[in-house]
C-alpha cells in the first residue's frame, strides 16, 4: 500500500479475524491505513483504523505467511479492546517498558489481568495455535483457550 492509502478488510482478512474474535468486532467498520515511515510499526489510534508505518500493510493479510497474519491479529486485538471501552492511549502508557509484550501464563489468571499488549500477544498466539502453527515459545492451545473469553467461531 502507498502512504495515506486506506482500505476496508478483505474477505480473507475477515476470516482471519473470526478465528480469534468470532463476531465480537464489527468488521465492516475496520480500516487498514498506510502511514509514511515513522518509528512505530503499527497502531490503532482511532478505535477501528489500524495504521501501519514502519512496515508496509499487505494488500490482503490472508495472502501473507502465518507470522504476518498473526501480527494482523495482534493489531485487531486493539480494535477489539477499543470496542470494549478500553482507552488505548491511556492503556498503552500503562503497558510501556521492555517487557510490555511478554507474559507468563498462570492458572486462573484472566485476560483482564494482562496489559493490552500482552492481551494482543495472547490473541496472536491463539491464532497461530488454532490454525495449527503454534509458536513454540507460547503457552499451549489448551492454556490459551482457558484465558481467552471468546470461543472459536464455528
PLM features: what roles do these ranges have?
Residues 6-31, 45-49, 83-154:
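Metalloprotease/metallohydrolase-associated module, dominated by Zn2+-dependent proteases
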Residues 40-42, 52-73, 110-112:
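Short pre-active-site segment immediately N-terminal to the catalytic Zn-binding motif
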Residues 70-82:
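Active-site recognition of the HExxH zinc-binding catalytic motif
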Residues 35-39, 56-58, 77, 85-87, ...:
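Short, solvent-exposed loop/turn segments at secondary-structure junctions
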Residues 1-3:
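A short, surface-exposed helix-loop junction/capping segment
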